[in-house]
Regions:
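Residue-level signal for inorganic ion chemistry
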Residues: 39, 79, 130, 172, ...
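Glycine-rich phosphate-binding P-loop
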Residues: 66-85
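Phosphate-binding/switch loop-helix module in NTP-utilizing enzymes
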Residues: 138-181
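Inter-motif core of Ras-like GTPase G domains
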Residues: 179-192, 213
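N-terminal phosphate/diphosphate-binding loop that engages ATP/GTP or pyrophosphate donors
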Residues: 84-146
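Conserved beta-strand elements of the Class I
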Residues: 95-99, 187, 267-271
């Protein structure tokens, strides 16, 4: 079985829009957005072709670059994997830096070295969250991993090398950032059967499934409901990844930890900025709150 067929069969089983014919509003929305998805597909395919043919050339940084990304809009566990990889490599003795995009922040053009006091409006929420996760444990050497926020990852990468002597640069959400040459492309796919292979804006895919051919490593996040990929006839290694909640952090005191069992039996109000929040909701439900 090919990777494309495998993913199309497994991912499309229970996407919310799979009940289109039971939800007239969803049908109308999808139909209205489909022409824009065709246009988006043309733009994405043309851009990828230019890079594949070498007509557009990526910039090369004087360091090893690892990209961690996805082909959908959020909910794949990309950020936790960035944090894990940064901690792991740093503890192995590598000088590591994380390059975040700083979406919807003031760091689109200038490089911001994130600190605990950096306003989220300056660096972006993901960059600040990555920094705080890297610095949450006082005993971890990963407190010394710098996080740089800038839409221009080449620019922030040069600063990471010159200012911190970084040997390894981890690019958060870098799969579509083809302007930058990378040593390894890690792509996460959601394997909880929540997404259909429709491109934005009619669906949740940023690229077609065929783009996975560019990946060096594919990680299936929380693959409890997906058949094993061990027998897939593909060149890329496919790994299974699970995530679980271990602790809570008060927003006003990010360095203080609260036991995760505090959720059990409590009335919980949850909100998030994840593109596909179904996994977050299921995770909270598994912690047995009295009301969510």
């Amino acid at each position: 079985m090919s990777i494309r067929l495998f993913l199309e069969q497994s991912i499309t089983r229970s996407y919310p829009f799979s009940n289109w014919w039971k939800n007239g509003i969803s049908v109308v929305i999808c139909i209205l957005f489909t022409p824009f998805s065709w246009l988006y597909s043309l733009v994405v395919s043309s851009r990828n072709t230019l890079y594949d043919l070498g007509w557009l050339k990526p910039k090369i940084l004087p360091s090893q670059v690892i990209s961690v990304g996805n082909i959908t809009v959020g909910g794949t566990g990309k950020t936790p994997h960035v944090v894990y990889l940064a901690k792991f490599l740093h503890q192995k003795g590598f000088r590591v830096a994380v390059l975040a995009a700083g979406y919807r922040s003031k760091s689109n053009k200038q490089v911001v070295v994130v600190s605990n006091d950096t306003p989220v409006s300056v660096c972006g929420d993901e960059a600040l969250m990555i920094y705080r996760q890297l610095t949450a444990d006082q005993s971890q050497k990963s407190r010394n991993v710098p996080v740089l926020s800038c839409r221009n990852r080449y620019k922030s990468g040069l600063q990471a090398v010159s200012q911190f002597g970084s040997e390894v640069l981890i690019v958060d959400d870098g799969f579509q950032h083809r302007q930058l040459e990378r040593m390894i492309d890690i792509v996460l796919i959601k394997s909880e059967n929540q997404l259909a292979p429709k491109l934005l804006p009619a669906g949740a895919f940023r690229e077609p499934l065929s783009s996975l051919g560019r990946a060096d490593i594919i990680i299936q996040s929380s693959p409890t409901k997906l058949e094993s990929a061990d027998n897939l006839n593909i060149n890329q290694p496919v790994f299974n990844s699970y995530y679980r909640a271990t602790r809570l952090y008060p927003i006003h005191e990010p360095n203080r930890q609260i036991g995760i069992d505090e959720i059990s039996g409590a009335r919980v109000f949850a909100f998030c900025g994840i593109g596909n929040p179904s996994g977050f909701s299921k995770l909270l439900q598994s912690l047995d709150p009295a009301d969510l």
